[in-house]
From Swiss-Prot:
<comment type="function">
    <text>Small subunit of the arginine-specific carbamoyl phosphate synthase (CPSase). CPSase catalyzes the formation of carbamoyl phosphate from the ammonia moiety of glutamine, carbonate, and phosphate donated by ATP, constituting the first step of 2 biosynthetic pathways, one leading to arginine and/or urea and the other to pyrimidine nucleotides. The small subunit (glutamine amidotransferase) binds and cleaves glutamine to supply the large subunit with the substrate ammonia.</text>
</comment>
<feature type="active site">
    <location>
        <position position="345"/>
    </location>
</feature>
<keyword id="KW-0547">Nucleotide-binding</keyword>
<dbReference type="InterPro" id="IPR029062">
    <property type="entry name" value="Class_I_gatase-like"/>
</dbReference>
<keyword id="KW-0963">Cytoplasm</keyword>
<keyword id="KW-0028">Amino-acid biosynthesis</keyword>
<comment type="subunit">
    <text>Heterodimer composed of 2 chains; the small (or glutamine) chain promotes the hydrolysis of glutamine to ammonia, which is used by the large (or ammonia) chain to synthesize carbamoyl phosphate.</text>
</comment>
<dbReference type="InterPro" id="IPR035686">
    <property type="entry name" value="CPSase_GATase1"/>
</dbReference>
<keyword id="KW-0067">ATP-binding</keyword>
<feature type="active site" description="Nucleophile">
    <location>
        <position position="258"/>
    </location>
</feature>
<dbReference type="InterPro" id="IPR036480">
    <property type="entry name" value="CarbP_synth_ssu_N_sf"/>
</dbReference>
<comment type="pathway">
    <text>Amino-acid biosynthesis; L-arginine biosynthesis; carbamoyl phosphate from bicarbonate: step 1/1.</text>
</comment>
<keyword id="KW-0436">Ligase</keyword>
<dbReference type="InterPro" id="IPR017926">
    <property type="entry name" value="GATASE"/>
</dbReference>
<feature type="domain" description="Glutamine amidotransferase type-1">
    <location>
        <begin position="179"/>
        <end position="370"/>
    </location>
</feature>
<dbReference type="GO" id="GO:0005524">
    <property type="term" value="F:ATP binding"/>
</dbReference>
<keyword id="KW-0315">Glutamine amidotransferase</keyword>
Length: 392
């Protein structure tokens, strides 16, 4: 292993050893307290441009499964996207020897193959304590013998444009009951799986697609998760504003998760703010304000919606974080639209809130019933969609 250093801008440095790619990188340092699921976390597009610090001390002990494995819908079985999305990882104790029946390579070999920096042998407890007190910080992993990059503010970059699909994709259901449009801001594979498994033919659009022009072809619209500052997604926000203002689609069901929740809030006139160190874990309690029930949720976000800035006659808070009291969801007062900051489809993580997908499909069923009782589909002219089947 080469000598390596984890360096925080205007903060401490930590000496260790590289077990990933022989290159230095920079990015925003964030941490996750999740105990398992490092393959899913590292391939989650929401982590794009970030250096992920694991609080779990032993990482890599069950290796990395095959990227070739597919499920019954031909979606990736073990990962949230087809490549590692994090800029680098920081672990206390890397397990070079791994053991799991699905594993085909070590975490270190995977990082080397994907060109991702990785450092071990550092005190992650001290790093996380610093990040909790000072907030998520610009940082670098410096590997001996490689060029030194400048500190990079990934949050000032339009990261969604990097991870969103460049063409319209299509994932068919075996027994379809609905057609759903997904705005891909960095959508996780398990979100697509959660929709298709419930009978949705899913059409995945680029983040800047004019969804307002084709929404009339669909029974519902889903706004996906994704990386970075939501305010950089100007095109998506403007498109959503037009969609929400369309008088012919006032009853179209819409569901947003994570960044999709934030973009829906911005399109509705609300504001977002950056959290000091974000919420990234599999065990965060959130209360459903409509029932008073508490659910354990999986989260990965550095920004939050300010519910006080939403139009109060149209929106009300849906969920609240019981740790820091931040907003975790909102629901429209008269239309079938709702969103959550957390991930109901958690992989890994708890499945307490998976029924929110069922709520979305119930809204779709009501919408389809409403349309069947009308004499026409309430959009005058809809352009054709050129789409490619399969999601890599």
């Amino acid at each position: 292993m080469s000598q390596a250093t984890f360096e925080i801008k205007n903060g401490p440095s930590f000496s260790g050893y590289s077990f990933g790619a022989d290159k230095s990188i920079s990015g925003e340092a964030v941490f996750t307290t999740s105990l398992v699921g490092y393959p899913e976390s590292m391939t989650d597009p929401s982590y794009r441009g970030q250096i992920l610090v694991f609080t779990q001390p032993l990482i890599g002990n069950y290796g990395v499964p095959s990227m070739e494995a597919r499920d019954e819908y031909n979606l990736l079985k073990h990962f949230e996207s087809s490549h590692i999305q994090v800029a680098g990882i920081v672990v206390a104790d890397y397990a070079a020897q791994y053991s799991h029946w699905t594993a085909v390579e070590s975490l270190g070999d995977w990082c080397k193959r994907e060109g991702v920096a990785a450092i071990t042998g550092v005190d992650t407890r001290e790093i996380v304590q610093y990040l909790r007190e000072q907030g998520s910080s610009q940082s670098r992993i410096l590997v001996e013998g490689s060029d030194t990059p400048k500190f990079y503010d990934s949050m000032a970059t339009h990261l969604v444009a990097e991870v969103s699909t460049k063409e319209t994709l299509y994932v068919p259901a075996k027994n379809p009951v609905a057609n759903i449009a997904v705005i891909d801001c960095g959508v996780k594979v398990n979100i697509i799986r959660s929709l298709v498994a419930r009978g949705a033919n899913v059409t995945i659009f680029p983040h800047n697609a004019r969804i307002q022009d084709v929404a009339g072809q669909f029974d519902g619209v889903f706004l996906s998760n994704g990386p970075g500052n939501p305010e950089t997604c100007h095109e998506t926000i403007e498109n959503l504003k037009e969609l929400l203002a369309n008088e012919d689609l006032q009853q179209l069901p819409i569901f947003g998760i994570c960044l999709g929740h934030q973009l829906l809030a911005l399109a509705s006139g609300g504001k977002t703010h950056k959290l000091q160190y974000g919420n990234r874990a599999h065990n965060i309690p959130a209360m459903d304000l409509t029932t008073g029930q508490c659910h354990i949720t999986s989260q990965n976000h550095g920004y939050a919606v300010d519910p006080q800035t939403l139009p109060q006659e149209e929106w009300k808070p849906y969920f609240i974080n019981l740790n820091d009291q931040s907003n975790e969801g909102m629901i429209h007062t008269t239309r079938p639209i709702f969103s959550t900051q957390f991930h109901p489809e958690a992989k890994g993580g708890p499945l307490d809130t998976m029924p929110l997908f069922d709520k979305f499909f119930n809204n779709i069923e009501c919408y389809k019933t409403h349309l069947s009782q009308s004499s026409y589909r309430m959009v005058s002219q809809i352009p054709a969609i050129d789409k490619k089947e399969i999601m890599a």
